[in-house]
């Protein structure tokens, strides 16, 4: 990591300074653009696919259709009517709603639904995805500016590289994960500030928010902090005494962050003990994912396939259990990520450590024992390699570091990067679509030619910024469209179906049971989702969620 520069003393703010507003915008213009541009691009992607309010489609697919939307509709009903958030009768004959919220509903944006009509809930979900993609880009820009003391359009370029990475575009329908993923740059920034300056507030708040918004993805944030701790202390080794101090300080502040979320994590933990997932066991024999054989050749085959998934324009994995990890984050990040390893101004130790960090995460996608540990000592049910966004994050940071140090790169460094990208494209033959390979090759060629000319001092860095900006905005727009098209959309015309009739039946059952002490239960003869009771707000027996009590599941057969 670069040495932290001593900051100048801030000038006092006075009421007479009329340029304060303009000064603030001027200072933060690129941070604002890092939010606005992704917001516009992602909204446009949904608009092209005619997602409401731009048409008659909606983003509700797979678990967003069957789980997240019904649960959010149920939560909105509870918030509007002041009902208990500790228990719900709309699922499984009665469930621990606090535990269910801890996994599915703790996005801060969800609490805004109390101010919205229920008819706007689908549009709210769509715009919440847009906001989270934009926030991921903005938080990445904040991280890069704070760490590398850079404030130009490159913040927007590399912010978009993370915000439109394949993980976001493939799993945006998994709205419950997005908050923690988009907070990742803030967790990383808090970690850096803790290590380098001893400042702990951002670290505690960001890590606590990561765990609170989704404890499952928050686990990956905790593992990443551990890996960052190891990497930092190797690169910046300053003796055993300093190392012990770092361990103590990081441990204390991590416990504080976890403690702040204990009121939610403990109910979730005890709830998980009663789920079907609690009986998982550690694999005892060596086995790999992706590769066809459980040996060295299988591992090499898996590495080749994973590297091919850095290809731009490739359709992201959506839910397939045998899919490759979503790790693509733009052609520019791929090219500059290679230049990181050839830069003469980056120490060999830092190159080795960062290379090992990415290598370890790639190997974790392959070796099932590591995959099992990453996912909380469980194997995933569909949607594999859920930590893969961290690979994209590290690569984007490495690429930005290389971009800052382009002056030290030679034409031979650029040629080496071009050869490696060509190798990645070759790896993709037979695995990726032809249009994706050709598109990546063309853009990589443009980038490498420009970098070559820059090393020869033929084109200035301002030209690089302009062209790279156009490239990344184009790639981001394409990634958004490909992501929405691959995920697919559904029609709004019959979801939920028969609302008025269902409401009338529920009112009728309430009137029949109004003078009794017993609580009625009901179920649909023809279901639309796997959580119709939550969707329509009646006392139901069926349920489908990861926090379901296994005994109740067995009871209902």
Predicted feature descriptions by range:
Residues 62, 66-79, 83, 108, ...:
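Periplasmic/ER-lumenal interhelical loops and adjacent helix-loop junctions
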Residues 45-148, 152-185, 209, 213, ...:
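Active-site lumenal/periplasmic loops and adjacent helix-entry segments of GT-C-fold
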Residues 136-144, 183-195, 223-231, 334-341, ...:
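Transmembrane alpha-helical segments
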Residues 238-248, 339-369:
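Membrane-interface helix-loop-helix junctions at transmembrane boundaries of multi-pass membrane enzymes
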Residues 38-39, 130-146, 153-235, 246-269, ...:
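Membrane-embedded helix bundles of polyisoprenyl
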Residues 197-198, 217, 352-372, 377-501:
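Contiguous transmembrane helix-bundle modules in multi-pass membrane proteins
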Residues 1-49, 249, 449, 454, ...:
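Start-transfer (signal-anchor) and selected internal transmembrane alpha helices
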Residues 115, 434, 461-557:
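Soluble catalytic regions of membrane-associated enzymes that act on cell-envelope
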């Amino acid at each position: 990591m670069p040495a932290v520069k001593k900051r100048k003393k801030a000038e006092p703010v006075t009421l007479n300074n009329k340029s304060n507003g303009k000064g603030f915008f001027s200072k933060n213009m690129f941070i604002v653009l890092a939010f606005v541009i992704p917001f516009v691009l992602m909204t446009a992607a949904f608009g092209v696919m005619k997602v409401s309010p731009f048409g008659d489609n909606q983003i509700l697919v797979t678990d967003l259709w069957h789980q997240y939307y019904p649960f959010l509709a149920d939560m909105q009903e509870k918030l509007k009517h002041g009902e208990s958030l500790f228990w719900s009768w709309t699922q499984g004959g009665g469930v621990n709603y606090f535990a269910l919220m801890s996994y599915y509903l703790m996005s801060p944006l969800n609490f805004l639904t109390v101010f919205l009509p229920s008819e706007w809930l689908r549009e709210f979900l769509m715009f919440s995805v847009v906001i989270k993609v934009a926030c991921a880009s903005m938080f990445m820009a904040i991280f890069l500016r704070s760490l590398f003391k850079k404030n130009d359009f490159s913040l927007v370029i590399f912010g978009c590289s993370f915000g439109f990475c394949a993980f976001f575009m493939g799993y945006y329908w998994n709205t419950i994960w997005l908050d923690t993923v988009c907070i990742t740059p803030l967790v990383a920034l808090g970690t850096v500030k803790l290590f380098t300056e001893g400042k702990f507030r951002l670290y505690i708040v960001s890590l606590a928010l990561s765990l609170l918004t989704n404890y499952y993805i928050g686990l990956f944030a905790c593992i990443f902090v551990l890996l960052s701790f190891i990497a930092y202390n190797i690169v910046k080794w300053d003796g055993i005494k300093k190392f012990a101090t770092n361990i103590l300080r990081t441990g204390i502040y991590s416990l504080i962050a976890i403690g702040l979320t204990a009121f939610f994590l403990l109910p979730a933990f005890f709830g998980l003990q009663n789920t079907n997932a609690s009986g998982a066991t550690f694999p005892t024999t060596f086995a790999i994912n992706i590769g066809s054989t459980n040996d060295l050749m299988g591992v090499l085959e898996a590495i080749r396939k994973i590297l091919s998934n850095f290809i731009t324009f490739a359709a992201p994995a959506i839910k397939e259990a045998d899919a490759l990890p979503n790790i693509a984050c733009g052609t520019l990040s791929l090219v500059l990520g290679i230049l990181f390893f050839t830069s003469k101004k980056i120490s060999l130790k830092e190159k080795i450590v960062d290379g090992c960090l990415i290598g370890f995460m790639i190997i974790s996608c392959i070796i099932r024992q590591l995959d099992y540990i990453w996912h909380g000592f469980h194997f995933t049910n569909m949607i594999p390699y859920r930590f893969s966004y961290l690979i994209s994050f590290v690569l984007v940071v490495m690429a930005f570091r290389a971009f800052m140090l382009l002056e030290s790169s030679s034409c031979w460094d650029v040629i080496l990067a071009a050869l490696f990208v060509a190798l990645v494209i070759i790896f993709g033959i037979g695995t990726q679509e032809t249009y994706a390979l050709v598109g990546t090759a063309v853009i990589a060629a443009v980038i490498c030619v420009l970098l070559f000319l820059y090393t020869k001092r033929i084109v200035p860095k301002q030209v690089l910024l302009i062209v790279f900006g156009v490239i990344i905005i184009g790639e981001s727009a394409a990634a958004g469209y490909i992501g929405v098209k691959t995920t697919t959309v559904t029609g709004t015309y019959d979801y939920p179906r028969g609302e008025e009739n269902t409401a009338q039946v529920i009112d009728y059952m309430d009137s029949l049971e109004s003078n009794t002490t017993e609580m009625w239960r009901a179920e649909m003869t023809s279901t639309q989702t796997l959580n119709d009771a939550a969707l329509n707000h009646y006392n139901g027996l069926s349920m489908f969620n990861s926090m379901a009590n296994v005994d109740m599941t067995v009871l209902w057969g």
